[in-house]
A protein has these predicted regions:
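N-terminal leader/linker segments that precede catalytic domains of diphosphate-processing enzymes
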Residues: 1-90, 94-111, 115-142, 146-149, ...
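NUDIX/MutT-family hydrolases
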Residues: 154-191, 198
């Protein structure tokens, strides 16, 4: 039996990916988002994809390429929000005037989860991605939680939960599937994840799931999973205006 990968191996892989994106050798990722229509009057936004060493119970799934105690920071948006209500997301939001994506991602993460940005090592950014549903162009910022700090729901009007999800749980084929959105005679299928948590099972779908799915593929972490398995939506999407 092979030894479990060391958790800090993931940091080296993430650093290699951001370096390849920066010098143009990473290839084109996130095809599902790149094929989507670009917003006509987009607003700039950034999200923080923050990996670290789990502070809770390690995953029960023995993933091939990541350790059981590697995690990623996620939050569940409040169900009362007008945009993406109830969805699991990365911390993040719109850029203020004159603000850069890295600064915005760290600021929003602090405002939404209470984390201390001083404990985050920013590894770099990925390609800016269109989010046509809410008219945004989003820059993912990859980070490593070198010195973790407590996180919590800071504003209940914005978030319902803040949690650190074991990456091995996300990679577990038993927790993977697709969601299907049907509207106006059209159908959109996308990757989805079930994330076990103390408060129940969270469904990760939409933009966040597409980014995680594409990121795992690019890092070589993905395990074979059933792409025909449908996971029912717990919160139906509604159009923004």
């Amino acid at each position: 039996m092979s030894a479990e990968p060391a958790p800090h191996r993931a940091r080296a892989q993430l650093e290699a990916l951001t370096a390849a994106v920066a010098d143009g050798t990473a290839g084109r990722g996130f095809s599902a988002l790149r094929s989507a229509p670009v917003p006509t009057d987009p607003r700039a936004a950034a999200v923080l994809i923050l990996f670290g060493i789990l502070d809770g119970v390690p995953s029960g799934h023995a993933a091939d390429d990541v350790s059981r105690d590697l995690d990623v920071l996620l939050l569940a948006r409040a169900t009362t929000l007008r945009s993406h209500p109830g969805q699991v997301a990365f911390p993040g939001g719109r850029l203020d005037e004159g603000e850069e994506p890295i600064a915005a991602a760290l600021r929003e993460a602090e405002e939404e989860t209470g984390l201390d940005p001083a404990g985050v090592d920013v590894l770099g950014t990925l390609e800016t991605l269109p989010l046509a549903f809410s008219q945004h162009l989003v820059t993912p910022v990859l980070g490593w939680w070198q010195h973790p700090s407590p996180v919590r729901v800071v504003d209940e009007a914005e978030s319902a939960a803040v949690f650190r999800a074991p990456v091995a749980d996300l990679l577990d084929p038993a927790n993977r599937g697709v969601t299907v959105v049907r509207r106006d005679g059209q159908e959109w299928r996308g990757p989805a994840f079930h994330v076990p948590h103390a408060t129940g099972i969270h469904l990760v779908w939409g933009f966040t799931a597409v980014v995680l799915d594409g990121l795992f593929d690019r890092l070589g972490w993905t395990e074979p999973w059933d792409r025909a398995r449908e996971l029912p939506l717990t919160v139906e999407p509604r159009p923004t205006r």
